[in-house]
């Protein structure tokens, strides 16, 4: 027969186990989306939370940990295969298995693109914070910058090594309605400058083929 003390201990253990289970949020809970969320909903939720909790924008002590948690959730749910596995085996089994497989943090991925242009064009955190924000992202994602010049005024090439920012740039092109953009994979922005009485027309051309994005300025004058 169970004693009152053993029953009490058993009840305490059940409560502790329940609290641990509830404390372990799913990736859907972290992003604030339902399990049936579409790819688009997941992208929007990630972008909103990443902007809110980025340590250069949010000064709370737990902002960086929250930012990493958000990125980890998005990394999994934005990939169809990873999301399917996650939904099948559950949060605990997936995260434990992920550590054993050596996938590590999403911040260990390698990204090759120019952060100066990123913060200059989209001005995430204000003009006075561009440099600090750029360095913070570089430190998190182990970014290697690589720029090259061509005869067409300037040429920059970005090679996306992972999927974390690939979708972000795609959505940003739609978010910021630059004049002259179309809905194809080839986007142009046209500007006009006059030098010493002559007319010079310049356009910035951005081309995307797969994971490779190239940008250059093409000018023609009379």
Curated annotation (Swiss-Prot):
Pfam families the record matches: DnaJ
Database matches in CDD domains: DnaJ (cd06257)
GO biological process, one term: response to unfolded protein
Modified residues (Phosphoserine): 133
Post-translational modification (record): Not N-glycosylated.
Annotated region (Divergent targeting domain), positions in chain: 91-222
Subunit structure: Interacts with HSPA5/BiP; interaction is direct. Interacts with ERN1/IRE1 (via the luminal region). Interacts with DERL1.
Primary residence: endoplasmic reticulum
Protein name: DnaJ homolog subfamily B member 9
Disruption phenotype: Perinatal death in approximately half of knockout mice. Death is caused by fetal growth restriction, reduced hepatic glycogen stores and hypoglycemia. Surviving adult mice display constitutive endoplasmic reticulum stress in multiple cells and tissues. Elevated endoplasmic reticulum stress in pancreatic beta cells is associated with beta cell loss, hypoinsulinemia and glucose intolerance Conditional knockout mice lacking Dnajb9 in bone marrow show impaired hematopoiesis: the number of myeloid cells is increased, while the number of erythroid and B lymphoid cells is reduced.
Keywords, ordered alphabetically: Chaperone, Endoplasmic reticulum, Phosphoprotein, Signal, Unfolded protein response
Record domain J: where: 26-90
Signal peptide boundaries: 1-23
InterPro entries attached to this UniProt entry: DnaJ_domain (IPR001623), DnaJ_domain_CS (IPR018253), Hsp70_co-chaperone_J-domain (IPR051948), J_dom_sf (IPR036869)
Sample GO molecular function, one term: protein-folding chaperone binding
Domain notes: The J domain stimulates the ATPase activity of HSPA5/BiP, while the divergent targeting domain is required for efficient substrate recognition by HSPA5/BiP. The divergent targeting domain specifically recognizes and binds to aggregation-prone sequences.
Purpose: Co-chaperone for Hsp70 protein HSPA5/BiP that acts as a key repressor of the ERN1/IRE1-mediated unfolded protein response (UPR). J domain-containing co-chaperones stimulate the ATPase activity of Hsp70 proteins and are required for efficient substrate recognition by Hsp70 proteins. In the unstressed endoplasmic reticulum, interacts with the luminal region of ERN1/IRE1 and selectively recruits HSPA5/BiP: HSPA5/BiP disrupts the dimerization of the active ERN1/IRE1 luminal region, thereby inactivating ERN1/IRE1.
Cellular-component GO terms for this entry: endoplasmic reticulum; endoplasmic reticulum lumen
Location within or outside the cell: Endoplasmic reticulum lumen
């Amino acid at each position: 027969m169970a004693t009152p003390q053993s029953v009490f201990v058993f009840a305490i253990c059940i409560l502790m186990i329940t609290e641990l289970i509830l404390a372990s949020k799913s990736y859907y809970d972290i992003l604030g989306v339902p399990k049936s969320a579409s790819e688009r909903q997941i992208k929007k939720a990630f972008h909103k939370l990443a902007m809110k909790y980025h340590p250069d924008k949010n000064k709370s002590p737990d902002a960086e940990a929250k930012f990493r948690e958000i990125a980890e959730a998005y990394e999994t749910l934005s990939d169809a295969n990873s999301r399917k596995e996650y939904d099948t085996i559950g949060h605990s089994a997936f995260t434990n298995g992920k550590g054993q497989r050596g996938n590590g943090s999403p911040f260990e991925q390698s990204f090759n693109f120019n952060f100066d242009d990123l913060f200059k064009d989209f001005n995430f955190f204000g003009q006075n914070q561009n440099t600090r924000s750029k360095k913070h992202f570089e430190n998190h994602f182990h970014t290697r910058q690589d720029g090259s010049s061509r005869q067409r005024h300037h040429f920059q090439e970005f090679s996306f090594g992972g999927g974390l920012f690939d979708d972000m740039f795609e959505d940003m092109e739609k978010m910021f309605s630059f004049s002259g953009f179309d809905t194809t994979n080839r986007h142009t922005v046209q500007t006009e400058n006059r030098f010493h009485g002559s007319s010079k027309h310049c356009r910035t051309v951005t081309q995307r083929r797969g994971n490779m994005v190239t940008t250059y300025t093409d000018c023609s004058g009379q």
